[in-house]
């Protein structure tokens, strides 16, 4: 199976760290559970929802980049899926350097044929341009993400879709743990 992966919240459990940083930036004025829910929609959505100033956005980005990869661990059993798939690619809004830092830390670079990162010049999701580029090059079968934003472009170009730890409508498959990947995903 040839798989396109989102990065944050799909391969790596980064949202806890993001939530803690935004909670700090907001001076504890918003409960972490509420921050998490808004961040899961998108960072852009969360910044508008919480009316972050440019200074607060800059503070968030600075603090988030300073978090050790140790605090951004891969989800359990996802490495088993990476090992068993034919090919893996990443499409993320995260800057390439940040992706590489985390992949280097865990020794995971060899699992990915290509990474399209946020600073590569492609339009942001849900625009399908980056997905189409990767699909044309690698003949993908499945896109896995944790947000509807991750599956909309995949659907548009005809890929099967899987939402991870998200039960929103629209995906072909749903997973709460990667331990169930091959029991659940039938393509």
Regions found by a protein language model. Give the residues of each.
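Conserved SAM-binding loop
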Residues: 4, 11, 88-91, 143-144
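Asp-based, Mg2+/Mn2+-dependent phosphohydrolase catalytic module
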Residues: 1, 100-187
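Conserved Rossmann-like nucleotide-cofactor binding loop
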Residues: 10, 17, 96, 149, ...
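N-terminal helical cap/lid subdomain that shapes the substrate entry/recognition surface
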Residues: 1-76
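Ser/Thr-centric signal marking residues that sit
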Residues: 10, 14, 92, 161
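Short, acidic loop-to-helix structural element flanking the phosphoryl-transfer center
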Residues: 66-90, 96-100, 128
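A mid-sequence interfacial segment
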Residues: 45-47, 89-109
